[in-house]
Each structure stands twice: as C-alpha cells, then as structure tokens.
C-alpha cells in the first residue's frame, strides 16, 4: 500500500502527463511546511519562464512567516503579475498532487484575481 508521499507523487505524474499533451504554459507549485513556491513552465516543460516564492527577499521582509495562507496569496499575486509582464494570460494549474485546499487554494485564487486564467 503506497504511503501519502508516494500517492501525491503518483497524482502529480498523472497531472503533468495530461498537461504535457496540451502543450500549454504550466503554473507548477510546491508547498513545504515553511514556504510555498510557484513557477511558470513553458509548454515543452524544459524552461522556467518566471517564478515566485516566499524566499524572495522582498517577500521575506513583508511576511513574518512563509508557510501561511496569506503568504501563499501574496506569491499567487506576484506570479500572476510576472505572467502578465510576459504576456501570458492562460495557464494550466499543476498543484503537484497537493490537495486543492488551504495554501494551494489561496495561491490559485490570488493568481486568478490578478488576471491569470486556468
């Protein structure tokens, strides 16, 4: 019986395979206990176009803790602004097997509110 990490990675592989068939820009996220990371990856999957995370110096000054829903919303807003700067409006959301809840949902909602279409 697979443990929770193996199950998450299996879900992530399935999602990435479906997104790869579409050849669209992918908004990939990663969540750790302390931080959240977001990357815009091109359709071929070989190039990171933009990224944002709670490790960026500007955000570290602004946020006392990088592992909160508020921090995730700020990262979502920031990655959406960077995407608009590159002329990207539509992305496929790759939640990396994480449940669409809490910080993952906050990041996605903030990105949508700031102009990204999923």
UniProtKB/Swiss-Prot annotation:
Keywords: Ribonucleoprotein, Ribosomal protein, RNA-binding, rRNA-binding. CDD domains: Ribosomal_L18_L5e. Signal peptide: none annotated. The keyword Metal-binding does not apply. One of its GO terms (molecular function) is 5S rRNA binding. One of its GO terms (cellular component) is cytosolic large ribosomal subunit. Pfam families: Ribosomal_L18p (PF00861). GO terms for biological process: translation. This is one of the proteins that bind and probably mediate the attachment of the 5S RNA into the large ribosomal subunit, where it forms part of the central protuberance. Part of the 50S ribosomal subunit; part of the 5S rRNA/L5/L18/L25 subcomplex. Contacts the 5S and 23S rRNAs. Belongs to the universal ribosomal protein uL18 family. This is Large ribosomal subunit protein uL18. The lineage of its organism: Bacteria, Pseudomonadati, Pseudomonadota, Betaproteobacteria, Nitrosomonadales.
């Amino acid at each position: 019986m697979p443990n929770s990490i193996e199950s998450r990675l299996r879900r992530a592989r399935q999602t990435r395979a479906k997104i790869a068939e579409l050849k669209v820009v992918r908004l990939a996220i990663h969540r750790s206990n302390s931080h959240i990371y977001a990357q815009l990856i091109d359709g071929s999957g070989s190039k990171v176009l933009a990224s944002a995370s709670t490790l960026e110096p500007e955000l570290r000054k602004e946020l006392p803790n990088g592992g909160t829903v508020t921090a995730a919303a700020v990262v979502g807003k920031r990655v959406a602004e960077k995407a608009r700067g590159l002329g990207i409006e539509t992305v496929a959301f790759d939640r990396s097997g994480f449940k669409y809840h809490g910080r993952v949902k906050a990041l996605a909602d903030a990105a949508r509110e700031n102009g990204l279409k999923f």
